[in-house]
Amino acid sequence: MLKNINPTQTQAWKALTAHFESAQDMDLKELFAQDAARFDKYSARFGSDILVDYSKNLINEETLKHLFALANETELKSAIEAMFSGEAINQTEGRAVLHTALRNRTNTPVMVDGEDVMPAVNAVLEKMKSFTDRVIGGEWKGYTGKAITDIVNIGIGGSDLGPYMVTEALAPYKNHLNLHFVSNVDGTHIVETLKKVNPETTLFLIASKTFTTQETMTNAHTARDWFLESAGDQAHVAKHFAALSTNATAVSEFGIDTANMFEFWDWVGGRYSLWSAIGLSIALAVGYDNFVELLDGAHEMDKHFVSTDLESNIPVILALIGIWYNNFHGAESEAILPYDQYMHRFAAYFQQGNMESNGKYVDREGNAVTYQTGPIIWGEPGTNGQHAFYQLIHQGTKLIPCDFIAPAISHNPAGDHHQKLMSNFFAQTEALAFGKSEETVKEELVKAGKNAEEVAAIAPFKVFEGNRPTNSILVKQITPRTLGNLIAMYEHKIFVQGVIWNIFSFDQWGVELGKQLANQILPELADASQINSHDSSTNGLINAFKAFKA
């Protein structure tokens, strides 16, 4: 089990608090001027394909010394061992946390309740391989004998965000199949998707562990009704629907052949489930071999995370730097900024991964914490973000640490597009770190022909303070393997922070109350009668909704 250690009571936390008093005056210009080897000292390579540069952070050797001491005092190493060994570290739900077993490519036994889960994991992978080979190869036929052309994945949360993010990121590896993702219970999402597909050549994947998720099953029934308008015979459902679920009874009642039901387990959290059968849409989009490459990449990062000393451990370093800003500098958010259009959903994916995991105000003993936990995660691809929100990052009053991610090799080397993209990638972190002084601004204005009065008037608005921290993550190329590396790296960063903050990162009770109340409100919307069973605001909104509909 995970230890219950209040981080604020550790010697390291107290040392960091004292260190912060002097560290507030850290200046990145000075830090780089004082140490010509700073980049070499504060960067790390993962294999031959990924470079993580964390030198443009407001840290020095003393900062890192105290942060690593914090990791040791909160017994991070034993927590890592507990997760990988199958202990039930998701204590509020009594579950192990073993998404890492799904990508365990060594087949080393992984025990849960005395049973090795690897034979079951590998059996599902083999079933996925057989299924994807048949669909991609055209052997799987629809009810009129035509091959499948379109896949519609119906899920929500982890059953949607992960597969969608990955299939978009790996679009250069796509085969002939067209992928569609439906998640929102708003009827617009399913209706607009169904307009694009042909019932004779469409395969629906219904991704719901329990086969009871409201949004997913509402969309699934709408899809089935639409399909049967053309197919007619209920028996044809089996040729056009597959299930990613564990509820065989409900799957069968829906009309899906349980031979086309792909299992996963309660030790797989939704936001970590793309490695499981939930990733079937990924395998269909890019082929099973590329899906395995994705697993291999994640497994490589798992091995690094488990076996590397904390001081050289990339997810640990990133997590600790995040804690430094979150808990000592008072930063409330972090931006993830991929300079790769294919990765346009990467920030959204880890918005869920981080905020659902570490958005907790109660510690592992059930007490309200007295310190900050999970940050707000957001971001968009570069260079779009530069023309949207970078203004605030550069010259606003909020401290926003940023991760910049970019591939050295583009999948689309059109003209000089990639050089221009990368020039912006390099320029932004340099500008954020070192800024532009008032002296430089005035010199530029004078050279531009401005008189003294004009210079004095405009100069303050053109000054960049700098000292805005960033990590730069340079990848040789975005491939299934390197994408697997990156996803696992961020997963483990989130885990490390949760361990140190003494919270449970693998439950998500915060999503339950809204669902519970929605289930109570739903029958109240069935007719035009006035509602007075809630607070005045909710009553007023419901009654106004009914009036608008009348």
From Swiss-Prot:
Gene Ontology terms for molecular function: carbohydrate derivative binding; glucose-6-phosphate isomerase activity; monosaccharide binding
Gene Ontology process terms (BP): gluconeogenesis; glucose 6-phosphate metabolic process; glycolytic process
Location (main, coarse): cytoplasm
Pathway info: Carbohydrate biosynthesis; gluconeogenesis; Carbohydrate degradation; glycolysis; D-glyceraldehyde 3-phosphate and glycerone phosphate from D-glucose: step 2/4
Pfam families: PGI
Catalytic residues as annotated in Swiss-Prot or TrEMBL: E356, H387, K515
Keyword check for Chloroplast: no
PROSITE patterns, A to Z: P_GLUCOSE_ISOMERASE_1, P_GLUCOSE_ISOMERASE_2, P_GLUCOSE_ISOMERASE_3
Protein family: Belongs to the GPI family.
PANTHER family per record: GLUCOSE-6-PHOSPHATE ISOMERASE
Protein name: Glucose-6-phosphate isomerase
